[in-house]
Amino acid sequence: MLEARDITFGYPGAKPLYSGFSLQVEPGERVALQAPSGFGKTTLCRVLAGFERPQTGQVLVDGQPLPRRGVCPVQLIQQHPEQAVDPRLRMRKTLTEAGEVPQQLLDDLGIRDEWLQRYPHELSGGELQRFCIARALATRPRYLICDEVSTMLDAVTQAHIWHVLLDYVAQENAGMLLVSHTPALTARIATREVALA
């Protein structure tokens, strides 16, 4: 189980975004995090994936703190993929940062061989997001955090990406936390909703 236990987080000089917040995501569960814009959903996603540390409380997977080194069992896929890659690296290098990526996963995501030689700025947002998803799934995470992963993509690419993500969750019995401002998408994907605000 992925658990946020009584966490408090805020940026220096500002009041906490949340105080004493707790959340549990079970394996196989797809939880939608609901809150208005500006309430700290993206920040919470970063805390749960280990990119930020809470001032108080803990983030645990099966009762253990997130590892400080190595591959994290919680992988975050962000809304803006260009912020998740090194602009100086070709995509082949970016893709293999966390290890070998199975060819079947590249095929499932529609990643073309010629894209591997390109730099991030030479790809569209949808193409770049596919790389970020492949890199995350290649680590075989137990929990996926999907923060507005398909917001700025066309409908066909959105459907393709969600098909791959949901197949992974089903096959691996992985848990998912998702943030989306599209009620129809949330209703279709989530097994449960949690209000942050």
Residue ranges and their predicted role:
Residues 1-4, 8-20:
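A short, flexible loop at the N-terminus of ABC-type nucleotide-binding domains that lies
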Residues 49:
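Helix-to-loop junction immediately C-terminal to a conserved catalytic motif
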